[in-house]
Amino acid sequence: MPKFTLKVLWLDNNVAVAVDQIIGNGTSPLTCYFFWPRNDAWEQVKAELESKPWIEEKERIELLNKTTELINCWQEQSKKYSFKEIQSKFPDFIFAGAN
């Protein structure tokens, strides 16, 4: 069972990602939202995860890979797919909002 998930704001001009820890049937925020392309969200997520030594390297890598996949999808496909299709592509993420 995963210990972490990504929370996503899917917007027209930005995508924002935050990391939440899964606790029981709920989640607890670990980070604030980091925006792409306004800022380098990937680097910010990386720095935030590295500042938490109790998160295993394997989990950090997995979260960063998921962040990369999400950002790439937003850049390449946001105009091609509906929001529902995007949500179905990332079923383990929590979509907190969209335009």
Swiss-Prot record:
Part of the 30S ribosomal subunit. Its main location: plastid. InterPro entries: PSRP-3/Ycf65_sf, Ribosomal_PSRP3/Ycf65. GO terms for molecular function: structural constituent of ribosome. Probably a ribosomal protein or a ribosome-associated protein. GO terms for cellular component: chloroplast; ribonucleoprotein complex; ribosome. Keywords: Chloroplast, Plastid, Ribonucleoprotein, Ribosomal protein. This is Small ribosomal subunit protein cS23. It holds the Pfam family PSRP-3_Ycf65. It is found in: Plastid, Chloroplast. Belongs to the chloroplast-specific ribosomal protein cS23 family. One of its GO terms (biological process) is translation.
